[in-house]
Amino acid sequence: MKASKGRNVVVVGTQWGDEGKGKLVDWLTESAQGVVRFQGGHNAGHTLVINGVKTALHLIPSGIMRPGVKCYIGNGVVLSAGKLFEEIEGLEKAGVEVRSRLRVSEACPLILPFHAALDVAREAAREHGGAEKIGTTGRGIGPAYEDKIARRALRVQDLKYPERFAAKLRELLALHNHVLSTFLGSANFQFGDALKPYITGGQVQFEPVFEEAMRHAEMLKPMMADVSRELNEAHAAGANLLFEGAQGTLLDVDHGTYPYVTSSNCVAGNAAAGSGVGPGHLHYILGITKAYCTRVGGGPFPTELDWETPGTPGYHMSTVGAEKGVTTGRSRRCGWFDAALLKRSAQVNGLSGLCITKLDVLDGLRELSLCVGYELDGERIDLLPMGAEEIARCVPIYENIAGWTESTVGVTHYENLPSNARRYLERIEQVTGVPIAMISTSPDRDHTILMRHPYAAD
């Protein structure tokens, strides 16, 4: 194969998701010819603001907002065809051409209505039994990945063969309806309106699921592709590719705050497995991190603040940062920047550089705290532990840093930032050992400070 001059960049979240990856992916696609989603499902939410217009995406790569950029959904994504077409139709109404530019891997496992039903039932059963909820979005992501790992999933390619699809579907329904009946017996809850058309007497019915899947199949066929082959051919031809991670490192099923995690690998290494592009072709790993920390749902959060009481720094972050989930609308928990957490993320991702987002949210705070380590059971440590129970016992060790009252909104040159903002960023670099490549100073695409371009040659 001919040597390529193309450069491939992986973008990953370094915290618990919601770091602002969508904006940065959109910004970077000016230098890319293709953008790839490689894990997760429609539980992820990316918000883009372009010329003042806000667009929320859940499945389709953020590069779709750049005319001419090809977008790929890789084999590591679990796909709800219904949600995909909802998103396509919304973009088309806004004048965005999607279908000719989007390719979907035939190897993607499908999310079907019984996956969402299982997700909802399990969370209800946990709550009924007195256990803390995991905090899933209830969209069927986890159960769909379970079917994949158990080697029984229906995949996109199965949609091309109705008889094969029907036979596999009947087998899956027999299994999952049995499990559903067990959950229904242990918790009193109701399925939401979105699931009611598929369920009779607490059981997911074959006909509505099959008929809907066949309708989706006809619409999806023109976009089905061998995504691995297309990406490798594009790379060989010299194209720059961008791999767009969803969620964040601390939600990774292996490296996150287990069990309060998602069901996929969110780390940079999965960009290869989830797309079919070899790891030797991934040239730069950009870690996206907020200038503070947020988390949605349950699980330990060492630097969490009181974010509900007016007048507190946490409340400032929550309100000024508009910290509500794109997918669920749930309020995000807020806390100080955690450099010990970021050091863990830097290790497991092999970060080449950082992009600090939402720096402008800290405008007006006169004093900031930066977590540089923890005290755990009487011992000082400077790296986030692996276990959720240990993380929950961590007491943050803070450095206090002077804040700033000047506005950073819209600043596009580093030297124009307030001096205290520069000191804060430089201290983050020193403690984490990762150079800052980019800084975001508002949700707008153009409000970005570039220090080192990820697509520039080393």
Curated annotation (Swiss-Prot):
<feature type="binding site">
    <location>
        <position position="151"/>
    </location>
    <ligand>
        <name>IMP</name>
    </ligand>
</feature>
<protein>
    <recommendedName>
        <fullName>Adenylosuccinate synthetase</fullName>
        <ecNumber>6.3.4.4</ecNumber>
    </recommendedName>
</protein>
<feature type="binding site" description="in other chain">
    <location>
        <position position="137"/>
    </location>
    <ligand>
        <name>IMP</name>
    </ligand>
</feature>
<dbReference type="Pfam" id="PF00709">
    <property type="entry name" value="Adenylsucc_synt"/>
</dbReference>
<dbReference type="InterPro" id="IPR042111">
    <property type="entry name" value="Adenylosuccinate_synth_dom3"/>
</dbReference>
<feature type="binding site" description="in other chain">
    <location>
        <begin position="43"/>
        <end position="46"/>
    </location>
    <ligand>
        <name>IMP</name>
    </ligand>
</feature>
<feature type="binding site">
    <location>
        <position position="332"/>
    </location>
    <ligand>
        <name>GTP</name>
    </ligand>
</feature>
<dbReference type="InterPro" id="IPR027417">
    <property type="entry name" value="P-loop_NTPase"/>
</dbReference>
<feature type="binding site" description="in other chain">
    <location>
        <position position="330"/>
    </location>
    <ligand>
        <name>IMP</name>
    </ligand>
</feature>
<feature type="binding site" description="in other chain">
    <location>
        <position position="262"/>
    </location>
    <ligand>
        <name>IMP</name>
    </ligand>
</feature>
<keyword id="KW-0963">Cytoplasm</keyword>
<keyword id="KW-0547">Nucleotide-binding</keyword>
<feature type="binding site">
    <location>
        <begin position="45"/>
        <end position="47"/>
    </location>
    <ligand>
        <name>GTP</name>
    </ligand>
</feature>
<dbReference type="InterPro" id="IPR001114">
    <property type="entry name" value="Adenylosuccinate_synthetase"/>
</dbReference>
<feature type="binding site" description="in other chain">
    <location>
        <begin position="18"/>
        <end position="21"/>
    </location>
    <ligand>
        <name>IMP</name>
    </ligand>
</feature>
<comment type="pathway">
    <text>Purine metabolism; AMP biosynthesis via de novo pathway; AMP from IMP: step 1/2.</text>
</comment>
<feature type="active site" description="Proton donor">
    <location>
        <position position="46"/>
    </location>
</feature>
<keyword id="KW-0479">Metal-binding</keyword>
<feature type="binding site">
    <location>
        <position position="18"/>
    </location>
    <ligand>
        <name>Mg(2+)</name>
    </ligand>
</feature>
<keyword id="KW-0436">Ligase</keyword>
<feature type="binding site">
    <location>
        <begin position="17"/>
        <end position="23"/>
    </location>
    <ligand>
        <name>GTP</name>
    </ligand>
</feature>
<keyword id="KW-0658">Purine biosynthesis</keyword>
<feature type="binding site">
    <location>
        <position position="45"/>
    </location>
    <ligand>
        <name>Mg(2+)</name>
    </ligand>
</feature>
<dbReference type="GO" id="GO:0046040">
    <property type="term" value="P:IMP metabolic process"/>
</dbReference>
<dbReference type="InterPro" id="IPR042109">
    <property type="entry name" value="Adenylosuccinate_synth_dom1"/>
</dbReference>
<feature type="binding site" description="in other chain">
    <location>
        <position position="247"/>
    </location>
    <ligand>
        <name>IMP</name>
    </ligand>
</feature>
<dbReference type="GO" id="GO:0000287">
    <property type="term" value="F:magnesium ion binding"/>
</dbReference>
<dbReference type="GO" id="GO:0005737">
    <property type="term" value="C:cytoplasm"/>
</dbReference>
<comment type="subunit">
    <text>Homodimer.</text>
</comment>
<dbReference type="InterPro" id="IPR018220">
    <property type="entry name" value="Adenylosuccin_syn_GTP-bd"/>
</dbReference>
<dbReference type="GO" id="GO:0004019">
    <property type="term" value="F:adenylosuccinate synthase activity"/>
</dbReference>
<comment type="similarity">
    <text>Belongs to the adenylosuccinate synthetase family.</text>
</comment>
<dbReference type="InterPro" id="IPR033128">
    <property type="entry name" value="Adenylosuccin_syn_Lys_AS"/>
</dbReference>
<feature type="active site" description="Proton acceptor">
    <location>
        <position position="18"/>
    </location>
</feature>
<feature type="binding site">
    <location>
        <begin position="440"/>
        <end position="442"/>
    </location>
    <ligand>
        <name>GTP</name>
    </ligand>
</feature>
<dbReference type="GO" id="GO:0005525">
    <property type="term" value="F:GTP binding"/>
</dbReference>
<keyword id="KW-0342">GTP-binding</keyword>
<dbReference type="InterPro" id="IPR042110">
    <property type="entry name" value="Adenylosuccinate_synth_dom2"/>
</dbReference>
<keyword id="KW-0460">Magnesium</keyword>
<comment type="function">
    <text>Plays an important role in the de novo pathway of purine nucleotide biosynthesis. Catalyzes the first committed step in the biosynthesis of AMP from IMP.</text>
</comment>
<feature type="binding site">
    <location>
        <begin position="358"/>
        <end position="360"/>
    </location>
    <ligand>
        <name>GTP</name>
    </ligand>
</feature>
<feature type="binding site">
    <location>
        <begin position="326"/>
        <end position="332"/>
    </location>
    <ligand>
        <name>substrate</name>
    </ligand>
</feature>
